Curated annotation (Swiss-Prot):
Pathway: Protein biosynthesis; polypeptide chain elongation. Its main location: cytoplasm. HAMAP family: EF_P. GO terms for biological process: peptide biosynthetic process. This is Elongation factor P.
Length: 186
């Protein structure tokens, strides 16, 4: 049993007797109240999705499923194909990747963990930190140095990340895949 606050994207939880893949988590805190955790979920067996809200201390069953270390191979619409060390290929639907799809690129060297439920690949968990190149961002605003200045940047793979003002096109940056936050220049 894990608390709702400990749940991460890629986890599979049991709700009302059915397995659900967590695609996104969002935690909000208020001054007097406990943390509220909003989970974006996709049913493992059906193609339905939902959003559920829990208190941070709510307990839920996390299913321990088979996981394999795999590398990204190619995209065959609407499937992402991953390959293990024995050259077995596994198809994962694009919908099952959630926000992780923005970080998956051709030639990706990072190893991902593919999760299986009843023999079917249902989700992919990326490494905690990945390095991607900035392909577009606005130039820095001259003289705007008060506080922590951030701006949007498009990275290889098409995802958008909020980066520090000093980041330029062509820079390689480190991103935390759990939160989608810029960490540092690589």
């Amino acid at each position: 049993m894990k608390t709702a606050h400990e749940i991460r994207p890629g986890n599979v939880i049991m709700l009302d007797g059915s397995p659900w893949v967590v695609q996104k988590t969002e935690t909000t805190r208020s001054g007097r109240n406990a943390a509220i955790v909003k989970l974006k979920l996709k049913h493992v067996l059906l193609d339905s999705g939902t959003e559920q809200t829990f208190k941070g201390e709510d307990k839920m069953d996390v299913i321990v499923l088979e996981r394999l270390d795999c590398t990204y191979s190619y995209f065959a619409d609407p499937m992402y194909v991953f390959m293990d060390a024995d050259y077995n290929q596994y198809d994962v639907e694009a919908d099952n990747l959630g926000d992780a799809a923005a970080y998956i690129i051709d030639g990706m060297e990072e190893t991902c963990q593919v999760t299986f439920y009843e023999g079917k690949a249902i989700s992919v968990e990326l490494p905690t930190h990945i390095v991607r190149e900035v392909i577009y961002t606005e130039p820095s605003a001259r003289g705007d140095t008060s506080g922590k200045v951030m701006k949007p940047a498009t990275i290889t793979g098409g995802g958008t990340v909020t980066v520090a003002d000093f980041v330029k096109v062509g820079d390689k940056i480190e991103i935390d895949t759990r939160t989608g936050e810029f960490k540092k220049r690589a």
